[in-house]
């Protein structure tokens, strides 16, 4: 759904493109539809958290403390970092449902676009073996991915006095601190995080893709499920 940034409102230029901020959810729906038809041997579930981030009298405010589904508290330092809040609860919920491996996809940060442009999806993980499986699926699907760090140093940037974790980590390494935030809720479950903010849609046509939504990373999702053993 639409993301204005809430009380921490986005600049007006290009805000109309925030209709694309649901591309991660759309990718999960598309992948689940294909997986249901192909019937691979592995059980796959899709969890899709949705929210509209709008300013208003009941809007979330900077300085609010919220309690996540996991029980951990989060200090809201910027209301435009709302996607990671709902992803955190979706991750916890998927674990409660019995997920043994997790892959999330989200147009999570502008920082990943600064780092990688529109050519590669940023990939973050806590498990090298799972990353190897994912990379093979992405390679066979023709979708370009780039491994990014999510070390403990990025978690340090999320420390806050009033809650277990803050929802932003400052200017530096924004894509990495966003991934570190999610890792807090993943814990030890093998996990892949895909920041598709730069690859989910294109403003201009490329030799390999027309402008508009790209459907990345649906093909990789489906290939991973098909090849799972």
Name each model feature, range by range.
Residues 1-229:
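A generic structural signal for tightly packed, nonpolar segments enriched in small/aliphatic residues
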């Amino acid at each position: 759904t639409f993301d204005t940034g809430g009380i921490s409102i986005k600049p007006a230029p290009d805000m109309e493109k925030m209709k694309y901020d649901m591309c991660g959810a759309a990718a999960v729906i598309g992948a689940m539809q294909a997986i249901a038809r192909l019937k691979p041997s592995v059980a796959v579930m899709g969890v899709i958290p949705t929210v509209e981030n709008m300013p208003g009298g009941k809007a979330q405010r900077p300085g609010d403390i919220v309690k996540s589904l996991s029980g951990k508290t989060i200090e809201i330092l910027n209301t435009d970092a709302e996607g990671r809040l709902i992803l955190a609860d979706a991750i916890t919920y998927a674990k409660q449902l019995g997920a043994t491996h997790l892959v999330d996809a989200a147009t999570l940060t502008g920082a990943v676009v600064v780092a990688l442009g529109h050519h590669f999806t940023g990939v973050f993980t806590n498990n090298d073996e799972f990353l190897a499986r994912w990379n093979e699926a992405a390679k066979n699907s023709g979708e370009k991915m780039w491994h990014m760090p999510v070390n403990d140093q990025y978690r340090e940037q999320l420390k806050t006095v009033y809650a277990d974790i803050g929802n932003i980590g400052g200017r530096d390494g924004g894509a990495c601190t966003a991934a570190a935030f999610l890792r807090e809720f993943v814990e030890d479950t093998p996990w892949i995080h895909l920041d598709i903010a730069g690859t989910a849609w294109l403003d201009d046509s490329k030799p390999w893709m027309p402008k508009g939504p790209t459907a990345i990373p649906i093909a990789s999702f489906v290939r991973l499920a098909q090849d799972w053993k």
